[in-house]
Regions:
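Bacterial Sec-dependent N-terminal signal peptides
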Residues: 1-20
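Histidine-centered catalytic micro-motifs
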Residues: 266
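Active-site His/acidic residue clusters
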Residues: 269-288
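Non-catalytic accessory regions flanking glycosidase/transglycosidase catalytic cores in CAZymes
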Residues: 18-247, 254-263, 294, 298-510
Length: 510
């Protein structure tokens, strides 16, 4: 029997109709959007290479001695792109990589740093990019550091010494060592991940069951807080789903770490939830995968809400989706999926407070033939959210035609959210048309006490052919198309959304 998908605050389960309406209710605030939902993630992933190695860190991002490198050896083109996107935070150094990582290998004179075998991905790690380099990169971007601790093969002493190195002013062995290496001022790293994918027993080094993980995480948090009481923690939620134990893992983590950690993480890559027989089907990709992504968020929220009811005296956990990515497709289909992930974060602004897109380098495209970097439609779609949707998120629902995909019914073709700018002066309504072939005409209205004011509204749209390949040669065509649309006297906007497109309306707030 199929599950009936209820997109809470998104759609009404109606029969297919000819008329589609997007209703925004600015009287119903979902929550304040945390800018950290637009964070990114990086880890060095190589494949059985001997030095000199090249992976998504060494080569593209860290490229000393090349024309694009800044004084610290990082690609200035990426730094400029991340600054334009206003990237708020970067999670590093892993990922699976961190389960075999010793942070002390990555400090001190570079010619004295050891080369290690990468236990997670194969190949070798030269440790030329370590703590001081990552911090310098984030300083150049203007982003926060989110350090993921090694609670796989690592130990708690190593974790607390890492915090001592980054956060203590002076007077201890590791804080003085940091100063000796040229960094007298502490980095004051605020966010610390309590391990990575420790539930993933088929792949992770140092796998633990949920009970053992909670015990280690509690002690690690206790140790780091003794070093710096201002730090915040991200508990390791589910990343392994096939055996069906993910919900039980999350339940135990929520029960054990509520009041200790500040966030619980989940990892979800867009195509991972699809059966291989449907993985290449268009509507499975934009429908079933989207519903699965929403379902994972709502399932964890339900567990957190239960714990809140049982222990109202404890600080509730918030969600960090600190690995996500719309992989498994190319071109505009990939962009649609990424935008749907971001729409989900906005839609659940009361609960999703942190995110980390995987990998950060995917936000700036590179042409395989020419080696040139350029801004693809995905860059511009990300920018629509990260620079605009920063205020409050509002209840938004769609009535209109729907479709079925996998075990899910009543998925609306239009996926819509509404959020204000950081200053509250503009309401951004972001709409994704998931229909493979058809444009959809819809009315947009504010059903709150203040209807949209009559006048012209700016519109930005991203679209493209499903078979189109993004290239450097076509880079000038990828910026959003800009237009205006009229708000009628009755406060409605009528607009026709192109098939497989992303559209954002910038509506002045009265």
């Amino acid at each position: 029997m199929k599950k009936l998908l209820s997109f809470i605050c998104l759609c009404l389960p109606l029969l297919a109709t000819a008329q589609t309406t997007i209703s925004v209710n600015t009287d119903r605030v979902i929550g304040k959007i945390d800018k950290n939902i637009y964070g990114v993630f990086m880890e060095p992933i190589g494949r059985d290479q001997e030095p000199p190695i090249e992976n998504n860190v060494y080569g593209p991002l860290y490229c000393p001695g090349t024309p694009n490198a800044n004084a610290d050896g990082f690609n200035q083109l990426y730094i400029d792109a991340f600054r334009e996107l206003q990237i708020p935070a970067m999670r590093w150094p892993g990922g699976n990589y961190v389960a075999g990582y010793n942070w002390e290998d990555g400090i001190g004179p570079k010619d004295q740093r050891p080369v290690r075998k990468d236990l997670a991905w194969g190949g070798y790690e030269t440790n030329q990019v370590g703590t001081d380099e990552w911090v310098a990169l984030n300083k150049a971007i203007g982003s926060e550091n989110i350090i993921c601790l090694n609670l796989g093969l690592g130990d708690i002493n190593s974790a607390r010494f890492w915090c001592e190195y980054t956060n203590v002013d002076h007077g201890t062995y590791y804080s003085d060592l940091r100063a000796k290496y040229g960094h007298p001022e502490p980095y004051k790293v605020k966010y610390w991940g309590l391990g990575n994918e420790v539930d993933g027993y088929p792949w992770i080094m140092g796998h633990k069951n949920a009970d053992d993980y909670v015990k280690v995480a509690i002690e690690a948090a206790k140790a780091l807080r003794a070093v710096d009481r201002s730090v915040q923690f991200v508990a390791n939620g589910s990343a392994y789903y096939p055996d069906g134990t993910w919900a039980e893992w999350n339940r135990k983590v929520v029960e054990g770490l509520t009041g200790i950690a500040h966030y619980i993480s989940i990892h979800r890559y867009w195509r991972d939830g699809l059966d291989e027989s449907r993985a290449d089907d268009y509507y499975s990709y934009v429908g079933e995968a989207a519903a699965d992504f929403e379902e994972k968020i709502m399932s964890v929220k339900a567990q957190v809400d239960i714990q809140k009811a049982l222990h109202p005296e404890k600080r509730s956990l918030m969600l960090s989706v600190d690995e996500w990515g719309a992989h498994g497709a190319a071109g505009i289909k990939n962009v649609l999926a990424g935008a749907m992930c971001l729409n989900s974060f906005v839609r659940h602004a009361d609960f999703v407070k942190m995110g980390a897109y995987t990998m950060a380098t995917g936000l700036l495209a590179s042409d395989r033939e020419s080696g040139q970097y350029y801004k693809s439609p995905w860059f511009y779609a990300y920018k629509m959210f990260s620079t605009n949707c920063l205020g409050e998120s509002f209840d938004t629902y769609v009535s209109g035609d729907t479709f079925s995909s996998g075990p899910y019914d009543n998925i609306p073709y239009l996926d819509a959210t509404a959020a204000t700018s950081e200053d509250g002066k503009t309401l951004f309504v972001t709409v994704i048309n998931r229909h493979e072939k058809d444009a959809i005409k819809a009315d947009i209205q504010n059903v709150g006490k203040n209807a949209f004011a009559a006048g012209r509204v700016n519109v930005s749209s991203i679209e493209g052919g499903l078979d189109d390949t993004f290239t450097y040669a076509k880079r000038d065509s990828y910026a959003p198309k800009e237009s205006t649309v009229n708000v009628a006297r009755d406060g409605k906007i009528t607009y026709t959304f192109p098939a497989h497109s992303i559209t954002q309306f910038a509506i002045p707030v009265k």
